[in-house]
Amino acid sequence: EIGSGLVGSEMCIRDSYYIQLGQRIGSQTFYDYFDAFGFTSRTGVDLPSETNFMQYYKADQLGEVQLASSAFGQAMAITPLQMCTAVAAAVNGGYLVTPHVVDKITDSNGNVIEEVGANVRRQVISASTSDAIRQIMEYEVGNGTGGGKYAYVSGYRIGGKSGTSEQLNMDRRTDGDYKKVASFAAVLPADDPEIIVYVMLDDPNNAKTDYSSLLAAPVVGNIISEVAPYLGIATDGEDRSGTTVTVPNLVGTEWSSAQVQLNIKGLKHQLAESESSQTAAAVTYQYPHAGAKVAYGTTVYLYTDTYEGQHTEVPDVTGKSADFARQMLSAAGLNCVVEGDANGTVQAQSEDAGASVQRGSIITITCG
């Protein structure tokens, strides 16, 4: 068969041309970097009973077959925390650091009693190499063609990489295939990472695919969509206030795929829970409906059962600040559009207090 020919680094990380890379650097160099990134020892996290079980080939055990399988992550057993510290080293300028649970301890007055500083264990790669890795990882998520696109969340610069491996030391599935581990690691902001989101799925049940980009990446994207605003992670700098988005048709789409489509468009999502709702099922109803023109950041309520449209009561937000009114409406399952002075107080609302409206409805508040 005809091969791919020469490929760039972005294509290499997307389609995993790692066996050739392993062959080129050789067994000793491969092991040296494997060790330098912390995969042969505990991370040193300040939690009790960190496991010391790690499975890997040492340099003198890496024959051609072992090197080939190790090069794409098939022949070793490591912990999720080891993976997180290694990814951090790859994108933070090249430094392997010891993870900590507590950043600092303060007294009741907010005075810092003890602060846990960064414990740099060693520099693994150069700053320039780390910068190149960040760019490649951002390309994987943001270019719209690789599997990393399923972790994309509009408004954020995200870098990421998927990983799929077989559990060779476990009993096989009933179909005779090996059990799989599907994972995805993301960092953001990609130009100056502050957080890592790592999701590892242990042989997902009832999955129609083994690809991590279709299994773990959407979960990462959904976590980012909730965590990034809460932590105040810097956005990509583009002002989207006043932007109008068209709601896509999600009926018949699997729940996980629906979430991805909304993340890409800059819309939030909420599963309208009932006794029979299932996150693994397909969407049967949505509100706002497909084709609706809504503000960037609007929440779309999705249903995975036959119940069409839960209702909620509109709270009285008159006299409240715009921010507090927005919070009250959100807590009631409603979207909010602010007209007038966004720093003022609510003078009027488009739906009367106490009215019963469909969950996900847009309430316009006029502030002054």
Where do the language-model regions lie?
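Ligand-recognition elements built from short beta-strands and adjacent flexible loops
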Residues: Q55, V116, Y152-G155, N169, ...
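Beta-lactam-recognizing serine transpeptidase/beta-lactamase-like catalytic domain environment
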Residues: S4, E10, R14-Y198
